Amino acid sequence: MRKSLIALSLVATLSLTSKAQSFVDTFDANSLGWTECAFESNKGSAVIDQGVMTIKSKGENKAAGAILTAMSGIATKVGENTFFETHCYAPLDVKKPFEVIAKVKIDKLASDRVCGFVFNYKDGGNFYCFNFNDEMVNFTRYVDNHVVGNITQGVKWENKKKLDQEWKLVYDGEVLSFYVDDMEILKVRYMLLDYSGIGFYTFGKQTLVVEEMTFTQN
């Protein structure tokens, strides 16, 4: 009887220790140390307020440029597309399997209005990301501010304005899978991770609102 009780106790202990551990960031506060830029710089902003995180970048004013070009007869460009990024260091061991889920709202997708899911972030010039516009999703690797690898998958979105999406990044120790609304968009094999930095970026006249994130260590 005693041996049976010990065996049952051991099974229960193993079950508890093998359970996935999750952390939910609801953005009621900056609990993970996200990099914020509360003022609107000439590149954009990243702000946590009222339970969401909002990332904005700036874009070329094509309408104003067209008017000035027509008036002057000289090709005139007003403004420029900017890149803006925010990140934190996730409560994960990236050497082991994990998944990250983000509930987001996107203002609009276009060829020059992009948003991205950043991970394996070491610093501003060294990171991986899944990024997409209205036509494609890319997996891109940056090393010392240079693109050293890129995989592209064409995608046709049902809507391109005011999108509500759920992004999911799944890593099993070798394979990275990126899902949008439970649909697998891109899979990358034999990819090892080293850094727990994770975040988002926008490019062009883009606004990305992150409502909630769930980090799960499997």
Model-derived segments and spans:
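Extracellular carbohydrate-recognition regions
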Residues: 20-43
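Bacterial Sec-dependent N-terminal signal peptides
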Residues: 1-22
